[in-house]
Swiss-Prot record:
Reaction(s) catalysed (UniProt annotation): N2 + 8 reduced [2Fe-2S]-[ferredoxin] + 16 ATP + 16 H2O = H2 + 8 oxidized [2Fe-2S]-[ferredoxin] + 2 NH4(+) + 16 ADP + 16 phosphate + 6 H(+)
Keywords (A to Z) from UniProt: 4Fe-4S, ADP-ribosylation, ATP-binding, Iron, Iron-sulfur, Metal-binding, Nitrogen fixation, Nucleotide-binding, Oxidoreductase
Family: Belongs to the NifH/BchL/ChlL family.
InterPro entries in UniProt: NifH/chlL_CS (IPR030655), NifH/frxC (IPR000392), Nitrogenase_Fe_NifH (IPR005977), P-loop_NTPase (IPR027417)
Record-given protein name: Nitrogenase iron protein
Gene3D superfamilies linked to this entry: P-loop containing nucleotide triphosphate hydrolases (3.40.50.300)
EC numbers, comma separated: 1.18.6.1
Residues that hold [4Fe-4S] cluster according to the record: C99, C133
Pfam family, one: Fer4_NifH
Domain of life of the source: Bacteria
One MF term in the entry's GO annotations: ATP binding
Cofactor note: Binds 1 [4Fe-4S] cluster per dimer.
Amino acid sequence: MTGLRQIAFYGKGGIGKSTTSQNTLAALVEKGQKILIVGCDPKADSTRLILNAKAQDTVLSLAAEAGSVEDLELEEVLKIGYKGIKCVESGGPEPGVGCAGRGVITSINFLEENGAYDDVDYVSYDVLGDVVCGGFAMPIRENKAQEIYIVMSGEMMALYAANNIAKGILKYAHSGGVRLGGLICNERQTDRELDLAEALAKRLNSQLIHFVPRDNIVQHAELRRQTVIQYAPDSAQAGEYRKLAEKVHANAGKGTIPTPITMEELEQMLLDFGIMKTEEQQLAELAAKEAAKAAAALR
């Protein structure tokens, strides 16, 4: 296990985290890297594009059928996908029942004990990032993931989630070896998105690893349950994911301890970039609209 890179992709739900991570890993495996993916999202969609299949059975659901995790064999939970990538989904309980994070803890312990981490160059955790609760923070807290990549966009909630995740990393950075590898911006075509992503990365004492342009080919590939790397290997978008993979690969040991900012500082940043309006601006716009309405009514 010498030189094993344990990385994690965090990000708010719906940001394209699983798509980004699977395309990046598909590009890495093309470089001859051996990879294990551990899905830590209750949606269990972290391996779908690598397996070209519907969501795979999760460790928790298989354990429930078998009686307990101890009754499982590694072969039952580990599936082999694109170019030999090993895939596992930890899963979660029914909505509203229990802690989804517990599935993450159970899975990682089971995989380690059964030798799933042997003979791989990368272990990649794909983690829900809206809530950095104990279970979802497990890969950080237990010093499993050493490099965290935050998938975000120029939308306010994605920036807010990125800052929150940075707080989670900072909490465990001194007790463990976890570092922020950088931000990955999934373009949503919002105003000044690249500038904003670079500015946030700088404020967090990090770097913008890559700006992934928006391209409908990603959706076309997803409908066929494939990564862009597999579906359209010669496309410009596949080239973007290869660039991202190259940057992640070259980023070993370059992670930083993040410097998260306050909510007020984040809002000020959005105001400075003209993304958010002050109350005065909003009131002035409202007054102008009302005046225009009143003038129109008098005509």
